[in-house]
Amino acid sequence: MASSPGSTPLAALLLLALFSASAASRFAPVDNHLIACGATGPAVLPDGRRFIPDTGCASMRLRSESSTLPTAAPNAPAAPSPLHAAARVFSCHASYDLAIRRRGHHVLRLHFYPFDATLASARFHVGAGGFLLLHNFTASSPVVKEFLLPVDTDVLALTFVPEAGSAAFVNAIELFSAPEELVGDIGTLVDGDDIIQTDGLSSQVFETLYRINVAGHKVTPFNDTLWRTWVNDEGFLVNKESSGSKAWSFGGRIAYPKGSKLMTREVAPDNVYNSARSVNSEGNLTWAFPVPAGNMYLVRMHFCDIVSKALYQLYFNIYVNGRQAVKDFDISGTTGYLAYPYYIDFVVDLEDEGLLEVAIGGSNMSRAGEVSGFLNAVEIMRMNQTGGGMDGDFPAILDMDYLFSKGIGEFARSLLCGLLFAGLFLVLVTLVVRLRTELKNNGTLWSRQSMDSGDGKLARAYQLVPTKTDY
């Protein structure tokens, strides 16, 4: 069928309007540093973001005690991402100073792709804003480390500290302003048998360990407004064949509340809420995640009722590490809508355990044989320790806010200058004392010997030293 005259321009206008609306709704951070470290030219990703080289950028400067080396990856095999084609290698302390236009929480991602043996064996520390992020870190395989940290200065110093005899490196840096709704201040503390409300979460630093899309496909940065990656839950599901377990997929529209500052697509994208796993009143589902022991964790569980046909039909229990964190959870009473996203933040202290488990199970209020509970997604983040470190403490001389705010190179230079000044002052005092002693002793000896001896050598040797006989 032939198209009518003018349909092509009309279609083009409609597409342009749709594209403009989509672009306008996409998250645009105030601070947005995208840096290709060691690169000679820009690196453009499939999601459209453009990373610029770490030299010649007005909003960023690189400081180091000695020259840093831009290193290019070998031609074969080809790097899986344009960000992995080069790296910046540090043989000593170095800092990136990143300008901050809006203070508050920022997302920081550090890309490590060790394309040679030197990088794979490098061992170093990384600090930012007075916090130790990585301690004795080695990237023997490709990895992206993501952090969510509060920034209260106009310049954020991102510092790399190689271990003695080793090097430090980084392939790419992302630092951008986080939306306010991404970080809440209140959570539920699961501490033994006590389930209590806790606050102060907004002042913490978080390291993302897991971001799971339950029963859904992998979500890439191309489909996430904050350029996150969500992986499928299959590898973490303990009892997939639990009674009444079912995977769900939703083709409708997720009902984000208009004008809400709490729930937006920046908290989690549609692709995360469009899938879920459910259990019936007799069953339960458990997910297990290996984590380092001796840390506190934020567990964020996402819920969006895409399984019910009507409101007020679901009641279920939520468990964290075997403890009942929420009893008879009523998602309809909480949100008042179907397909309406919601999340709960739990705080867990793992002193000796190296495994973190979350689970959903049927409630006594559930209808027998009917769908009872569900889960759409889960995020697990490690929280910073009281000493400001994510993974242990820095050596005492390095664990200083001044060091991170001013830069390690400047601190070391200041310390060296102070030591040199003190040494010179001590030498000067010693010389003055010795000179005064010699003036006194040698002056008396010269006067006596010049009268008793006819040898003039002693007088010539000390002829610039006056004595009483010279007046």
Regions found by a protein language model. Name each.
Residues 2-471:
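Compositionally biased, intrinsically disordered or flexible polar/acidic segments
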